[in-house]
UniProtKB/Swiss-Prot annotation:
Organism: Mus musculus (Mouse)
Family membership: Belongs to the CFAP144 family.
Protein name as annotated: Cilia- and flagella-associated protein 144
Name of the gene encoding the protein in the UniProt record: Cfap144
Transmembrane segments: none
GO BP terms: flagellated sperm motility
Primary location group: cytoplasm
Length: 135
């Protein structure tokens, strides 16, 4: 019985070696050695910013008119950029003109501050320094 266990162990080692060899060959088939390197054109390249206080980097560069127009266009408000609203949130306040002409003489909607004798008396007391505003 002990001999059989030894034989099983040897068969397992051979079998393991065969599995490892197959894995190694499969990896070698899938591997590709890259010797030429290039930048991926589909990926955005991050630029390295210069130091603002260095004198050698602050040389005058020609203005890019297209880039300046793009910056000025982005800084404008949405009403100047677009003829119509782009989102539902922009619909509120897009047209600031009132729908009806407000009549300031109509007392149904306009409640202006009106001074009578009692309100003038209390306002005078408050201006003189009376502390109890609640009474």
């Amino acid at each position: 019985m002990a001999g059989r266990v030894g034989q099983m162990k040897n068969q397992d080692e051979v079998h393991q070696n065969q599995i490892l060899r197959e894995l190694f060959l499969k990896e070698l088939r899938a591997q590709k050695l890259y010797t030429q390197y290039h930048v991926n054109p589909l990926r955005k390249v991050h630029t390295i910013t210069r130091k603002p206080m260095s004198w050698h980097d602050n040389l005058e560069e020609p203005e890019d008119a297209k880039f300046l127009n793009l910056i000025h266009h982005a800084a404008q408000g949405p009403k100047k950029k677009y003829s119509e609203t782009q989102t539902e949130a922009q619909e509120i306040g897009w047209d600031p003109n009132p729908l009806i002409n407000p009549d300031r003489q109509d007392h149904r909607l306009n409640h202006f501050r009106v001074y009578h004798d009692i309100t003038l008396y209390k306002a005078k007391l408050w201006s003189l320094g009376e502390d109890d505003h609640q009474k």
